[in-house]
Every structure is written in structure tokens, then in C-alpha cells.
């Protein structure tokens, strides 16, 4: 049960800041109707699954062969594998968002340190402008130097603020895109496991199986323990998987297309701004004079 608790906390961290209301409802469905039910009820129902699978034969190995034919993979193990695989995109999203947040903090710290260093230099110049060897100095050189340092620090602060804002916008766009991608993958996994459950088990667990698989020498009848209880559990897990698929589609409809359009529009605007900056810089590049031959060198050829 401790392993499931760790998984629950990780899933809560995944949707704490970046998920929608539908995503939080989906988390409740996954945690309560899947993890808790499989961990508490499923282990009790399927505890004696193989030991109570009895066939009316004494042939060695026949019971195991017929059980393998009836249940290629145990219900409870299939659902545990389904939970792990469906939660994997959310865990990848946690890793990505934490990495982006740490990168953003590193950028902010580096900007603060550079600004503080420039402020310190400006204060040193101010002290130097005030007294030199105990004599008051008001020279124009120190005043201009201090003004240039002040303008440089101010420009750096404004540039740092703009860069921080742009990096924050890019980070939010990247997190939104990654969130949409993980919802798409999660829904694809849900549909795949739902179809796999249908083809493996159907909607009913029969009380008796007929088996003639080797090493059985003839057709034998095998009996399953708690068939009605397992049928109810099977239908319940079908319903939970179907509900998760519907919630994933609703979440994509709620934020997916809108955020996809916003992300595409933002990428187009960034490309447009870069193109405009390059066009503004191109006249300056063309108008640069050629310093290869000066006027004095030209007059030497006259």
C-alpha cells in the first residue's frame, strides 16, 4: 500500500498547478476508483485465483495449462500494469515542469547577481567621486563615469526584466504544450488498455471453462472461484476506463485546441519579431563605410 501512496502524491503534484478542473476530477477517479479499489478490494477478490481454479482431472500440469488458457494474464496484474502505464505520461510531465522551474530560478539568480555587482561598482564610483585622499572632488570625469554606469545598470535591469518576462512566457507555453501531449498519450493508452481488456476477458467471467489443452488427455471442465464477484469487478473496471477516456476527451476539448492555437500563434509572432529585427539591422550593415582605403591613401594615387 505504501507504493500506491507514493504514486498518489506524485499524481497530485502533477495536477496541482497546471491542470484544469476536469484534470482534477480525473485524478480523483484514478486515485479512488482505480488505485484504492485495486489495492484494497482486488487483492482480496483475486487472492485465491489460481489455487481455487480446479479442473476435474488428475493429469499433472493440466490445471496450470487450462488456467493459462483461461487467463493469459491475471485481472489484477493487468490492471496494475494499466495504472502504471497510464500514470507514466503524468510522471514525465512532473519531471519536465520541475526541470523548467529550476532553470527559471537559475536565470533569476544569475540576473540578480549581475545587477548587484553593477550596483556595487556604481557605489564605489560614487565614493571615489566624493573624496580622493581626503579632498572633495566634483570633477566632470567622475560625474560622467557615474552617469554612464547608472545608465548601464538601469538598461541591464530593464533588459533583465524583459528577458525574464519572455522566458516565463516561453516556459508557460512549453509546459502547456507538454501537458496537452501527455493528455493525448494518456488517452491513447486508456483506449488501448480498454480494447485489450475486452479482447482478453470480455464482459463476463464464466463459472466453468472447457479445456483440451496439452497435457490434458481429454476435454476437461475447470471451475473458477467467485465468478459473479469477478464479473462485477470486471464490469466496474470497464466503466472506470470508459469514464477516464471521456474525461480525457473533455479535457482536450476544454483546453487542448485553444492552447494549441495560442501556442501556434505565439510561435508565429516570435518568428515575425525576429524577422523584423533582422530587417531593421540590415540597413545598418549595408551603410557601414569601407575603411579599407582612407582619404589619405586615395590621395597617394593622384
Curated annotation (Swiss-Prot):
Topological domain ranges for the Cytoplasmic compartment: 1-19, 99-177, 256-302
Keywords: Cell junction, Cell membrane, Gap junction, Membrane, Transmembrane, Transmembrane helix
GO molecular function: gap junction channel activity
TM region positions: 20-42, 76-98, 178-200, 233-255
GO cellular component, one term: connexin complex
Chain ranges on the Extracellular side, renumbered to this chain: 43-75, 201-232
Membrane-protein topology: Multi-pass membrane protein
Gene Ontology biological process terms in this record: cell-cell signaling
UniProt subcellular location: Cell membrane; Cell junction, Gap junction
Primary site of residence: membrane
Tissue-by-tissue expression: Retinal specific.
Pfam family, one: Connexin
Job of this protein: One gap junction consists of a cluster of closely packed pairs of transmembrane channels, the connexons, through which materials of low MW diffuse from one cell to a neighboring cell.
Family: Belongs to the connexin family. Delta-type subfamily.
PANTHER family for the chain: CONNEXIN (PTHR11984), GAP JUNCTION DELTA-2 PROTEIN (PTHR11984:SF32)
Quaternary structure annotation from Swiss-Prot or TrEMBL: A connexon is composed of a hexamer of connexins.
Name the UniProt record assigns to this protein: Gap junction delta-2 protein
Species, as recorded: Leucoraja erinaceus (Little skate)
Amino acid at each position: 500500500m505504501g507504493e500506491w501512496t507514493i504514486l498518489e502524491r506524485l499524481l497530485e503534484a502533477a495536477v496541482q498547478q497546471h491542470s484544469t478542473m476536469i484534470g482534477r476530477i480525473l485524478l480523483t477517479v484514478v486515485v479512488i476508483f482505480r488505485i484504492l479499489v485495486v489495492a484494497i478490494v482486488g487483492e482480496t477478490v483475486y487472492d485465491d485465483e489460481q489455487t481455487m481454479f480446479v479442473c476435474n482431472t488428475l493429469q499433472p500440469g493440466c490445471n496450470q495449462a487450462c488456467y493459462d488458457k483461461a487467463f493469459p494474464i491475471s485481472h489484477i496484474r493487468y490492471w496494475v500494469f494499466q495504472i502504471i502505464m497510464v500514470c507514466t505520461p503524468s510522471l514525465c510531465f512532473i519531471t519536465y515542469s520541475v526541470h523548467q522551474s529550476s532553470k527559471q530560478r537559475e536565470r533569476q539568480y544569475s540576473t540578480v547577481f549581475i545587477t548587484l555587482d553593477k550596483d556595487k561598482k556604481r557605489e564605489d564610483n560614487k565614493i571615489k567621486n566624493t573624496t580622493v585622499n581626503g579632498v572633495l572632488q566634483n570633477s566632470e570625469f567622475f560625474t560622467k563615469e557615474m552617469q554612464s554606469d547608472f545608465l548601464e545598470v538601469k538598461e541591464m535591469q530593464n533588459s533583465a526584466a524583459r528577458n525574464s518576462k519572455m522566458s516565463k512566457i516561453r516556459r508557460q507555453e512549453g509546459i502547456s504544450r507538454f501537458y496537452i501531449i501527455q493528455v493525448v498519450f494518456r488517452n491513447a493508452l486508456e483506449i488501448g488498455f480498454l480494447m485489450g481488456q475486452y479482447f482478453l476477458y470480455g464482459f463476463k467471467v464464466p463459472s466453468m471453462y472447457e479445456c483440451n489443452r496439452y497435457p490434458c488427455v481429454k476435454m476437461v471442465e475447470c471451475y473458477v472461484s467467485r465468478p459473479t464477484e469477478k464479473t462485477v469487478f470486471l464490469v466496474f473496471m470497464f466503466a472506470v476506463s470508459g469514464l477516464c477516456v471521456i474525461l480525457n476527451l473533455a479535457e482536450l476539448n476544454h483546453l487542448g485546441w485553444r492552447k494549441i492555437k495560442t501556442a501556434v500563434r505565439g510561435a508565429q509572432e516570435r518568428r515575425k519579431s525576429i524577422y523584423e529585427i533582422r530587417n531593421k539591422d540590415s540597413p545598418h550593415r549595408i551603410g557601414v563605410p569601407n575603411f579599407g582605403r582612407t582619404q589619405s591613401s586615395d590621395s597617394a594615387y593622384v
